[in-house]
From Swiss-Prot:
Function, in words: This protein is a component of the acetyl coenzyme A carboxylase complex; first, biotin carboxylase catalyzes the carboxylation of the carrier protein and then the transcarboxylase transfers the carboxyl group to form malonyl-CoA.
Pathway membership, UniProt: Lipid metabolism; fatty acid biosynthesis
GO CC, any one term: acetyl-CoA carboxylase complex
GO MF, any single term: acetyl-CoA carboxylase activity
Highest taxon above the source species: Eukaryota
Subcellular location per the Swiss-Prot or TrEMBL entry: Plastid, Chloroplast
BP-aspect Gene Ontology terms: fatty acid biosynthetic process
Gene3D superfamilies per the UniProt record, alphabetical: 2.40.50.100
Coiled-coil blocks: none
Protein name (record): Biotin carboxyl carrier protein of acetyl-CoA carboxylase
Main location, first listed in the record: plastid
CDD domains: biotinyl_domain
Entries under InterPro entries matching the protein: AcCoA_biotinCC, Biotin_BS, Biotin_Carboxyl_Carrier/Decarb, Biotin_lipoyl, Single_hybrid_motif
Length: 158
């Protein structure tokens, strides 16, 4: 199979449309490496629908800012909330050290850039900051739990 300009244009169009970040293509002497970072995705809040269920949330939109994802949802009771998700794999901690005051608990109001937890990854303590203001309505992980990249940590009512 030979790569033509038309096939290459179609491929690049698909990469752009599907927001693919990394693509490596090699065929014979031809090699293409594409790295692209998407900073923002349009945000939209979709009203709840009784027939659809996704993790107890009928509507879900993912927004990426500064490599931290937030999932905006609308509950069945039409409460809008954002879900703070882990930007990395590691161990989740509610407080800066054992025995110290926890960063946030259910019912607390959080401000933009306020530290909400720590994720330890490769012996480094990474402070996770809220990128939205609101009230913590649920903490989805326990202190000391291992979390994956993209895993939901907390729900914040907006």
């Amino acid at each position: 199979m030979q790569i033509t300009i038309k096939k290459l244009q179609d491929l690049l169009s698909s990469v752009q449309r599907k927001k693919i970040q990394t693509l490596k293509l090699k065929q014979g002497k031809f090699e293409l490496l594409l790295n692209k970072t998407y900073k923002k995705v349009n945000q939209e809040i979709i009203p709840s629908q009784k027939s659809a269920v996704l993790q107890n949330s009928p509507s879900t939109i993912i927004k990426s800012i500064n490599n931290t994802k937030k999932i905006f949802c609308v509950n069945e009771d039409r409460t809008e909330y954002a879900t703070i998700v882990s930007p990395m794999v590691g161990t989740f901690y509610h407080s800066p050290a054992p025995g110290e005051k926890i960063f946030v608990q259910v019912g607390d109001e959080v401000k933009f850039n306020q530290t909400v937890c720590i994720i330890e990854a490769m012996k480094l303590m990474n402070e996770i900051e809220a990128e939205i203001e609101g009230k913590i309505i649920e903490i989805l992980v326990k202190d000391g739990d291992i979390v994956d990249c993209g895993q939901a940590l907390m729900k914040v009512e907006t």
